[in-house]
């Protein structure tokens, strides 16, 4: 199936004109960080992919070399793509990052029809910590609810290269006790943006699996099967989601590493690109 998808995409990219409209630094909020770049295909009623970059929620930018080309090829297969920035910690404490993703989704939902898109065909893709954000937005309905949106307004969610819970933390709690870990949690500067151990734990998507989730497809590099434990936590999310009757699956890409998963998305022969498009085509009806 993947080979057929690749052949189709290469043929389409080679025959469809690369005509597209590009909007840069579009504001979806009042903060300077709340900006997105939007690539729009020369088509009508198209689906839109919303991408969130990685960087541990404290760094990263849509213009970084790892992320600047993520959206390039999607308009050539009649998919719009929004590459967004969001407020970063520790200057902006959690949950500013998740709130910004939800705000970006709301902006696209409200405005994409004016560009020819279908607001009912929205998909999320995130890399690394951005994958945590999209998985959370696709499972914890409180973020979208602030914009009068529901999880059913998302056609699909694709987390790429992120754990779904902190396994090291869970092991530490089991070994040393919750009280001891909680007392030391905020002494780590990286943890202070969360405000408490409870808020940190709650930001992991595994704690929000329930019935009524949009379809999930986890995209995993071969090197991520053990360290970090991306495969382990993604499989557990898939299993839990299926128990509630949701559609969820994962795909491991041979020969890929954490960053090569995202750096080659703009190449029409890229198998990760092909799987993303295939998933979107399946669910954009």
Per-region residue spans from a language model:
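Mobile cap/lid helix-loop segments that gate and shape the active-site cleft of serine hydrolases
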Residues: 31, 168-208
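C-terminal catalytic histidine-bearing segment of alpha/beta-hydrolase fold enzymes
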Residues: 39, 217-219, 223, 235-238, ...
């Amino acid at each position: 199936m993947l080979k057929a998808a690749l052949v189709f995409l290469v043929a389409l990219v080679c025959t469809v004109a690369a005509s597209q409209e590009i909007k840069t630094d579009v504001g979806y909020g009042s903060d300077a960080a709340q900006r997105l770049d939007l690539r729009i295909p020369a088509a009508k009623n198209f689906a839109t992919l919303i991408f969130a970059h990685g960087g541990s929620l404290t760094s990263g930018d849509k213009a970084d070399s790892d992320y600047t080309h993520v959206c390039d090829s999607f308009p050539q297969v009649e998919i719009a793509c929004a590459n967004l920035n969001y407020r970063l910690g520790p200057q902006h404490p959690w949950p500013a990052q998740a709130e910004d993703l939800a705000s970006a989704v709301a902006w696209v939902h409200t405005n994409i029809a004016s560009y020819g898109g279908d607001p009912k065909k929205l998909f999320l893709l995130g890399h690394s910590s951005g994958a945590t954000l999209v998985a959370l937005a696709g499972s914890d309905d409180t973020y979208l609810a602030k914009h009068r949106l529901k999880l059913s307004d998302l056609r699909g969610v694709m987390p790429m290269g992120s754990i779904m819970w902190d396994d090291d933390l869970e092991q530490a709690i089991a070994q040393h006790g919750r009280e001891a870990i909680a007392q030391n949690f905020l002494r780590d500067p990286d943890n202070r943006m969360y405000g408490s151990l409870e808020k940190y734990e709650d930001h992991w998507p595994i704690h929000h699996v329930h019935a009524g989730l949009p379809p999930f497809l986890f995209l995993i590099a071969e090197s991520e099967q053990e360290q970090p434990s991306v495969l382990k936590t993604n499989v557990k999310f898939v299993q839990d989601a299926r128990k509630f009757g949701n559609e969820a699956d994962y795909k491991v890409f041979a020969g890929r590493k954490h960053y090569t998963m995202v750096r080659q998305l703009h190449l029409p022969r890229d198998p990760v690109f092909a799987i993303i498009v295939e998933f979107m085509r399946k669910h954009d009806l």
